[in-house]
């Protein structure tokens, strides 16, 4: 008698199955908001790619809801872990993205504040960095800071190190 009870406890309840299906629909809806270049990097089936491309065409509420449910159905066949890992890297609302963003801001501040000594450590982490170009951007940012000008060059430094980080992570 205990064997039948143990078998029953391993099955998912109807409520649990519904929660999982709704989670897949929510993930599918998040995918509809991603840009095409990011979608291309995700391991998705062709049917799901087509469904995601069609999603903006469905503007009526009922049609959109049905289409999101269809996307949720197609999501059952996907590698959800791989999709979530990539979304966490590029979605600005996730903790991982924010941590990486703040780390890059700290690098920018160190590079502008410390100059060449910080540049050596940065180049060790990012060997693809163009030292000469980065050194020029840093000097320009230091000059702007010394003369109380708007931080346009500091933004360029940040943009460049963010591009290097994305290249190293395989996002570009």
UniProtKB/Swiss-Prot annotation:
UniProt keyword RNA-binding, yes or no: yes
A GO cellular component annotation in the UniProt record: cytosol
GO biological process: assembly of large subunit precursor of preribosome
Swiss-Prot/TrEMBL keywords: Cytoplasm, Ribosome biogenesis, RNA-binding, rRNA-binding
Keyword Transferase among record annotations: no
Subcellular localization, as worded in the UniProt entry: Cytoplasm
Segments traversing the membrane: none
Pfam families xref list: DarP
GO function terms (MF aspect): ribosome binding; rRNA binding
Cysteine pairs bridged by disulfides in the record: none
CDD domains attached to this UniProt entry: YjgA-like
Domain of life of the organism encoding this protein: Bacteria
Major location (coarse): cytoplasm
Cited function: Member of a network of 50S ribosomal subunit biogenesis factors which assembles along the 30S-50S interface, preventing incorrect 23S rRNA structures from forming. Promotes peptidyl transferase center (PTC) maturation.
Family, similarity comment: Belongs to the DarP family.
HAMAP family: DarP (MF_00765)
Protein name per its UniProtKB record: Dual-action ribosomal maturation protein DarP
Protein source organism: Ectopseudomonas mendocina (strain ymp) (Pseudomonas mendocina)
């Amino acid at each position: 008698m205990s064997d039948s009870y143990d078998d029953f406890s391993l099955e998912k309840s109807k409520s649990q199955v519904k929660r999982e299906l709704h989670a897949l629909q929510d993930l599918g809806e998040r995918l509809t908001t991603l840009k095409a270049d990011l979608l291309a990097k995700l391991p998705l089936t062709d049917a799901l790619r087509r469904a995601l491309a069609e999603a903006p065409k469905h503007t009526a509420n009922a049609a959109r809801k049905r289409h999101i449910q269809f996307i949720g159905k197609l999501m059952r066949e996907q590698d959800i872990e791989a999709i979530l890992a990539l979304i966490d890297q590029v979605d600005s609302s996730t903790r991982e993205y924010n941590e990486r963003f703040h780390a890059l801001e700290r690098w920018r501040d160190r590079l502008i504040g410390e100059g060449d000594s910080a540049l050596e450590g940065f180049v060790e982490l990012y060997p693809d960095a163009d030292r000469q170009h980065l050194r020029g951007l840093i000097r320009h940012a230091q000059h702007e800071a010394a003369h109380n000008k708007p931080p346009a060059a500091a933004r360029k430094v940040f943009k460049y190190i963010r591009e290097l980080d994305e290249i190293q992570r395989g996002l570009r």
